Curated annotation (Swiss-Prot):
Epithelial cells of the hair follicles and the epidermis. GO terms for molecular function: melanocortin receptor binding; type 3 melanocortin receptor binding; type 4 melanocortin receptor binding. The lineage of its organism: Eukaryota, Metazoa, Chordata, Craniata, Vertebrata. One of its GO terms (biological process) is positive regulation of melanin biosynthetic process. The keyword Ribosomal protein does not apply. This is Agouti-signaling protein. SMART domains: Agouti. The presence of a 'disulfide through disulfide knot' structurally defines this protein as a knottin. It comes from the Eukaryota.
Length: 131
């Protein structure tokens, strides 16, 4: 009995070890590390020098203003992209009102007549608010 428990404990330990080991990132070998260092030093010589320029207060204010203008224009474009909905039919049922089958269609084009309790209680509901 103790031998089987010992074997099961060993098996569980190995399974845990292999599970953790399989999820760890693979480490680079020394040979790969040397080749990476030599490649990175050669590649760094290929790039041109970069100069860092400090911004003054006026340029910061201008960039903020430009960013605000861009944000406003993008909001306006997003609001303009909405497609105009067709006008509702003249005899129509408002949202959340009763719309039993002989009743006319729902006023909201995104709403549909949804019936519950075996068709005894029907109401106009908007199923997709992003319609």
């Amino acid at each position: 009995m103790d031998v089987t428990r010992l074997l099961l404990a060993t098996l569980v330990g190995f399974l845990c070890f292999f599970t953790v080991h399989s999820h760890l990132a693979l480490e680079e070998t020394l040979g790969d590390d040397r080749s990476l260092r030599s490649n990175s030093s050669m590649n760094s010589l290929d790039f041109s020098s970069v100069s860092i320029v400090a911004l003054n207060k006026k340029s910061k204010k201008i960039s903020r203003k430009e960013a605000e203008k861009r944000k406003r224009s993008s909001k306006k474009k997003a609001s303009m992209k909405k497609v105009a909905r067709p006008p509702p039919p003249s005899p129509c049922v408002a949202t959340r009102d009763s719309c039993k089958p002989p009743a006319p269609a729902c006023c909201d084009p995104c709403a549909s007549c949804q019936c519950r309790f075996f068709g005894s209680a029907c109401t106009c509901r908007v199923l997709n608010p992003n319609c």
